[in-house]
Amino acid sequence: MASTANPMQVMKKKLEGKVVIVTGGASGIGQTAARVFAQHGARAVVIADIQSEVGKSVAKSIGDPCCYVQCDVSDEEEVKSMIEWTASAYGGLDMMFSNVGIMSKSAQTVMDLDLLEFDKVMRVNARGMAACLKHAARKMVELGTRGTIICTTTPLSSRGGQSMTDYAMSKHAVMGLVRSASIQLGAHGIRVNCVTPSVVLTPLAQRMGLATPDDFHTHFGNFTSLKGVYLTPEQVAEAVVYLASDDAAFITGHDLVLDGGLLCLPFFAPS
């Protein structure tokens, strides 16, 4: 008779007993990550997001141990309060997945850079990440927790592009933040890493016109060396779980790239 056991019940739960915060957890990669973290045995998964109705619905669908907290990461006081509440409510903080990110609606080329949109993107993507990392680190140090902080970046954090200049700049800033923090927080046993997915089939990608795997291959098939596959939110979430787990106990300051070989493509290829 075939076994009906849940595969996650058979697998090792890599976040057993951990208290975890996911910013941007109401949708996209963050929502999937919250579900995967709960499946991996997290004691508490706090979804921190500005999308209150969606966030509450996601937390309810995941069930115990998940909850939703309203938080605008561009407001440092809200970030601090959210982290304080989490540590007080659940008796600690083991992991921060700083995942929230936005893009401008326009192309944002250098010569047509809308600086109001630029400020908005930098406020969320760079300043917001810094606030999350700062206050998560402070709480972990205060509690003597050898925790882990993981930020979401993009291949544009190490490359330029024909557009999205403000987005690329904001993600370059995140990479610098991660590398600096990994050096400064190592003395406290806190590991800081980032995960760098290329295009994932999420609501953000859908707003770019990528609603299906076929759309992905049409627009980005030539920009990966690995053919016939595409990146899913679940794969990104499992990469984050790895970085947060004891399996990665000696990894800090690392950029775990999930790009199908995009960054390895040659600058010049024979015709």
Curated annotation (Swiss-Prot):
Changing residue 155 to S: Strongly reduced cis-trans-nepetalactone levels. Pfam families: adh_short_C2 (PF13561). It comes from the Eukaryota. Substrate binds at residues 154, 167. InterPro entries: NAD(P)-bd_dom_sf, SDR_fam. GO terms for molecular function: isomerase activity; oxidoreductase activity. The active site is at 167 (proton acceptor). Bifunctional enzyme that possesses cyclase and dehydrogenase activities. Functions as a non-oxidoreductive cyclase to promote the formation of cis-trans-nepetalactol. Functions as dehydrogenase to oxidize cis-cis-nepetalactol and cis-trans-nepetalactol into nepetalactones, metabolites that are both insect-repellent and have euphoric effect in cats. Binds NAD(+) as classical short-chain dehydrogenase/reductase (SDR), but does not utilize it for its redox-neutral cyclase activity. PANTHER family: SHORT-CHAIN DEHYDROGENASE REDUCTASE (PTHR42820), SHORT-CHAIN DEHYDROGENASE REDUCTASE 3B-LIKE (PTHR42820:SF21). This is (+)-cis,trans-nepetalactol synthase NEPS1. The lineage of its organism: Eukaryota, Viridiplantae, Streptophyta, Embryophyta, Tracheophyta. The gene is NEPS1.
